[in-house]
Amino acid sequence: MACKSVLFVTLGFLLSFCSTAKVNKHFFPQNFKIGVANAAAQIEGAWNEDGKGETIWDRFAMSRPERIFDHSSPQVAADSYHKWREDVEMVKEMGVDHYRLSIAWARIYPDGYKTEEPNAKGVAYYKNLLRSLRALGIEPMVTLYHWDLPQKLQDDFGGWLSPKIVDIFADYARTCFELFGDEVKWWITINEPKQICEAGYGTGVFAPGIVSPGVGNYKCAKNVLLAHAKAYHIYDKEFRKKNQGKVAIVIDSNWSEPASAKPEDQEASERALQFTYGLYGNPVFNGDWPAVVKERVAQRSKQAGLKESRLPALTKEEIKLIKGTHDFLCINHYTSHMVSAWYEAPVTDTSLTADIGVNDWMPKEWPRGGEGWFSVWAPGMRKLLNWLKNTYNNPEIVITENGLSDNTGTLEDDHRINYYRDYLSNCLDAIYIDNVNLTGYTAWSILDDWEWSTGYHSLIGMYKVDFNDLTGLGFLGSLLHTSPKSPRTAAWQKILENVYIKQK
């Protein structure tokens, strides 16, 4: 019987950060799926070609370049719209089971609104991509919305702040199910609503840049969940019988490690998790907002003299609509923080951070990734998987993103080998020791991309992209004899050779 093993060779070179953790040497179950991922806005480029409409990230990056670390934009990115065949070859070389990608809403409906006919060239692009993957035995996992809202919808009614978005998204979802349903068995409705809502409509650090802390983010959360639920029910009623696919929403979360065994620190950890994953996961899996979220926001709203909670209530009908809209549970996880109890912020501070009310930090001894928020602590993966198991009644879990950011651009990314080794080992601990129903793992990212507000500064790909030489003919590429897309020495190849072994 074929199995997949997590056996690692001893590396004969100095690692950028060293791990002393014991590596789990069990086998992944035979049906365990391993894949890689990326998203349309981050790699496709061709921002206004072949009928594609403007997105909120196009507008945000090009009209406010100071909001992007390197003042760049996604106009070209990794040029995958033109070089998709190369991307398919890269996925093939990796030998993975699935490739997670997203559809650019504005490439199907340029203004976001359903029209009599979708954009033919956009449809052809995705059909060619999906069929090529399937022909190679690679299962597409397709995300309908990965942050790139058509700008027209933001201009017309405020995007995710308005209930109008719910039915418009549902129309778009139905079109995608109709067009691509024969090629896709794994559908993701929406990716990381916490980032969409908190960063986009709370702090405003992401597109569309709306600053409305403690108000806009919660309005957005409700509309995102309703849009997801409507899309799920459309698939369930109209397409599931024919296409036999699965549908889920992707939610991201750090692990919040309690600073001590004190009850107040344990409570702080649980509260942080409920405000991050639970805010979106609880309505989908258990119905309604988490109790602690409702209680704290209502209390702080009342103390501030507001007549109603800043967190909009879900009606009985809405709870019924949202609850149960999952065929599996998705988690994007990169990093962990330490948390402890904290003082109560003034009620005039309406931010999500104030509503959570915990102190969080990264211990100095934890290694860092390429960004300031990124700490490396692999046990957080196992702990988070167990929390999801216990909180949501042991669902099937698929890790839909996990990876290490880097800002050196090196091809000798030994630190990434260590990261994947330790995080995958903790996944195996969760499966074999803790009986977590983990069935899939997806590494982010297949190649370097345009990483939103950090632009091209944060490099996280299995393939290095020379963003200055996407033609492959530039001086640097000629001098180094490299393609503009070059495999990093070892992270994924070492994983394939020594982790993803099929033992006969």
Per-region residue spans from a language model:
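Active-site region of glycoside hydrolase catalytic domains
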Residues: 20-68, 93, 111-113, 120-504
